[in-house]
From Swiss-Prot:
Residues that hold heme b 2 according to the record: 86, 187
Organism (species): Oltmannsiellopsis viridis (Marine flagellate)
Superkingdom: Eukaryota
Designated name of the protein: Cytochrome b6
Molecular function per GO: electron transporter, transferring electrons within cytochrome b6/f complex of photosystem II activity; metal ion binding; oxidoreductase activity
GO CC annotation, single: chloroplast thylakoid membrane
Pfam families linked: Cytochrome_B
Family statement drawn from the similarity comment of this UniProt entry: Belongs to the cytochrome b family. PetB subfamily.
Length: 215
């Protein structure tokens, strides 16, 4: 194995990269509350893994969505566990994200020169909430259906463009198959991709600027 590693290291300088990653200075004021962002990231990875596993069995149609979720819970090996972990990690991600935002705000981590780091964090917070809204509808049960109907109806109060926004969200005048398809696409592709991109930018800026100092 050492010869294989040496072969790759000679060409890619793996050891230099590893040394750079592992030798970053950590200020002495850093405590357990600075781990909240990392826990949020870990929860996101769990979400991706368990969500990907469920896509093999979930059917995003109004006629089969609920039955496919029931199938995952009752017939798929460990399906109940995978879905439960998905739900638990979703709650964990939201809770840790909120605590992380509070920690950053209270310690002044949003101030110059870290404004862009804060902006990417706020965007990811919006994505996190959007995960919850879109995922809530996917079982297409009574709770999910009426939640979607209420949420997508909120923009109707906006003057001039409200009705157009509602139709855009629903894929039509009423809530139906087009709505479920839109929410499924957002939940499984658009939001994960957007979150991953902003996470990368977030981490690179933290890496470049370092952890903010104490108050």
């Amino acid at each position: 194995m050492s010869k294989v590693y040496e072969w790759f290291d000679e060409r890619l300088e793996l050891q230099a990269i590893a040394d750079d990653v592992s030798s970053k200075y950590v200020p002495p004021h850093v405590n357990i509350f600075y781990c909240l962002g990392g826990i949020t990231f870990t929860s996101f990875l769990v979400q991706v893994a368990t969500g990907f596993a469920m896509t093999f069995y979930y059917r995003p149609t109004v006629a089969e969505a609920f039955a496919s979720v029931q199938y995952i819970m009752t017939d798929v090996n460990f399906g109940w566990l995978i879905r439960s972990i998905h739900r638990w990690s979703a709650s964990m991600m939201v809770m840790m994200m909120i605590l992380h935002v509070f920690r950053v705000y209270l310690t002044g981590g949003f101030k110059r020169p870290r404004e862009l780091t804060w902006v990417t964090g706020v965007i990811m917070a919006v994505c996190t909430v959007s995960f919850g809204v879109t995922g809530y509808s996917l079982p297409w049960d009574q709770v999910g259906y009426w939640a979607v109907k209420i949420v997508t109806g909120v923009p109707d109060a906006i003057p001039v463009v409200g009705a157009a926004l509602v139709e855009l969200l629903r894929g039509g005048v009423g809530v139906g198959q087009a709505t479920l398809t839109r929410f499924y696409s957002l939940h499984t592709f658009v939001l994960p991709l957007a979150t991953a991109v902003f996470m990368l930018a977030h981490f690179l800026m933290i890496r470049k600027q370092g952890i903010s100092g104490p108050l």
